[in-house]
Amino acid sequence: MEAHKPVLFDEVMEGLAIRPDGIYVDGTFGRGGHSFGILQRLGPNGRLMAMDKDPDAVAVANKALFEDARFSIVHETFANLQKAVRDRGWEGKVNGILLDIGVSSPQLEDAKRGFSFSKDGPLDMRMNPKQSMDAASWINQAAMEDIRRVLWNYGEERFAKRIAQAIVNAREEKPITRTQELSDIVIKAYPQRKIKKHPATRTFQAIRIFINRELDELRECLPQCLETLAVGGRLCVISFHSLEDRLVKRFIQKESRDHLPREIPILAKDIKHRLKPLGSLIRPTEAEIKKNPRARSARLRIVEKLS
């Protein structure tokens, strides 16, 4: 099976500095583009563990790579990365970890998954369909203030209050069960002015992040990455919006800067930083954006574990 070439592929492969006999973790298998790239660079003694909470992604991995003894996949969120690594006896031995945050292209393109405002389908949005709460269940029972808070906190939506009110008004007439229904409600609630993005972009993003606990899981995962990496190991994180990137940036700053109070009598040279940022923020080239417009908002940060 030939995998699609994912966002920032070359930059990730270079950033991971893959050793033929190394141990690597792809925390977000998706459709396997990055995992295939890692395997191409590993020797017979190298190992790659992938993770994904979407059963469709796990099925793709099992079908495409079941004969490769170097590869294994765990049907699990990367928020449980440390346990999965520990179960293999790899804690403190991992040479590289990749996290490619957010919704995947196949998830967006499948109307039945309910992630896209441009394709009519059931209002689902669960990355793992086995979890109990889907978007429709939540949107039809949440208080208006809770909806407003989610739209603002996870979508940075300026018109969160009026959209939340419009949702509550609409569901009083009949339950909201389709993506197109929600999209139409948001469009009607939006001020009639020229905007670059589709009016429902931030609303769908916010609800998806909330339903899947995306920021919570990223917040839980990052310290686990630090514990599982070997000294000299690399962490590459691709994010697609400012909320994710801000969280990653703050974690890196916390672990790579002096953060002891000044009154503590310790020399700067004696402070042991745990991470070292490698270069600055990496964005896709214009050539990549032209081939894949979805790459436009991607941002890559790479760090190395020092101690």
Swiss-Prot record:
Its main location: cytoplasm. It is found in: Cytoplasm. GO terms for molecular function: rRNA (cytosine-N4-)-methyltransferase activity. Keywords: Cytoplasm, Methyltransferase, rRNA processing, S-adenosyl-L-methionine, Transferase. Specifically methylates the N4 position of cytidine in position 1402 (C1402) of 16S rRNA. NCBIfam families: 16S rRNA (cytosine(1402)-N(4))-methyltransferase RsmH (TIGR00006). Belongs to the methyltransferase superfamily. RsmH family. This is Ribosomal RNA small subunit methyltransferase H.
